[in-house]
Amino acid sequence: MPALDKQKFFKVMEAEGVALTYNDVRMETRASEVSPQEVDTTSRFSRHVPLRMPFSSAAMDTVTESAMAIALAKYGGIGIIHAGLTIDEQYREVRRVKLHLNGLIENPMTVYGSQTLQEVLDICQEKQFDFRSFPVLDAKEKFVGLLTQKDFDFSTDLSATVESVMTPAADITHAPVGTSIHDAYDTMVKNKKKKLPLLDSTGKIAGLYVFSDVSRIVNDNSGMYNVDKNGRLVVGAAVPTDETAVDRVRALEKYLDVAVIDSAQGDSKYAFSTLKLLKEEFPTLDIVVGNVSTGESARRLAELGADGIKVGQGPGSICTTRIETGIGSPQVTAVWQCVEALKGLDVPVIADGGIQEPGDISIAIATGASSVMMGNMLAGTSEAPGNVIQLADGSSVKLYRGMGSPSALRDSAAARKRYGVGGIGQPLAEGVEATIAYKGSVTEMLDHYTKALRKSMSYIGAADIATHQKTTRFYRITNAGMVESRTHDI
């Protein structure tokens, strides 16, 4: 069969009753004037959460905590902190990501002009602050100056008041509320200032930019860091479909960009009720729901208010859902059906699971997904949770397990809820656990996947993701064709 445009290709497959996954298809090369460096990979994770690179890390306890989420955001993607943590533990992980790049300190620690230097030092010791710069307020809470490390360094009398050694407000460059990180950078460079207080219309402190962080964000990331409007890394968190969901999101809300309702069956009354509760309680927060594998399910969730749909039931390398239960659609067909069903609703699809090779990422995006979620492709790296295990033969491995594996169901209430475990006896496991080779830093993996996606889109002549999704033509490939596609006869 010749290569067909996407609509015709999937209609033919549908008419034949054939459902496809990544190894069943390849994409046709086209005349191209687009170099890999020119490709724009900007996309969205959910309705209001942007991506510079269409990658996300799976909410699994052997894949994503803060280290992985930080790495993903620095490469333009987003990490979803798993829910197999207590609320306090998940809060700390989310906060660690959000404050990793503290471009704008929204609520800076302040001191009063009437306090002594010794009193300030005592507070620093008590609260374990490792900084010594503070906006200074008067009795009416108005900004009157700035206390910095040099004021401590050159003071011989710690009983002196803050106001006697601080730099007064009249000598400090400041900016209004709403100043962007780039405008702040320009102002700080022009005036050679390391701190830039933001003041509201009444003269009260409303934020503080720190030059070291601002400079790192503006200059050091080549436009790849996925940051919010305040220059902080974007991060998401998984929540279970139970009574703790609202409390969990309420605890995380200050630092959270998106909540992901994590269920093996997203088209269920439990997911519906959790989505309804979260949208009512947090109307401005994006809520992604998953997982589903049919267009009807995706549209139903979107019409109930979901801001993104996670597609994939059973495609993961450590998932046994399809084998144990007989349900689920091969992933390419599932993504296609969900994308088609969501037309006109402006709700992105996340292709979750089944990515085995870098080329699969491009296929998922061409099929219509706005991003891909990866587990195995990121597991086994330094940034994945867990210790490196040294084997007797000298090799190094890390643990990788599905959230439906026996040990995950035993260890995590969120995992048990995700897989609908109830009743008596041992729960049905829908995943396995294994050790996988230690891969080193995930940054090397992400760099590889980024280059592969750009190269793929260049072969097709797609300068951006919208063009990739609109113009790519598909082949149905045979098993022999797939064998030929890999290295062979060597």
Predicted regions and their residues:
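Terminal amphipathic helices with adjacent charged low-complexity linkers/tails
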Residues: 83-98, 140-158, 188, 197-218, ...
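Short beta-strand/loop segments at the ligand-binding rim of alpha/beta enzyme cores
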Residues: 50-57, 104, 228-238, 278-293, ...
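Bateman/CBS regulatory modules and CBS-like beta-alpha motifs in cytosolic regions of diverse proteins
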Residues: 36-53, 58-60, 89-131, 136-138, ...
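Catalytic cores of alpha/beta
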Residues: 67-70, 244-254, 293-311, 355-370
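Catalytic beta/alpha-barrel core
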Residues: 80-85, 110-111, 133-135, 174-175, ...
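Alpha/beta catalytic cores of nucleotide-metabolism and tRNA/nucleoside-modifying enzymes
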Residues: 1-31, 111-112, 176, 183, ...
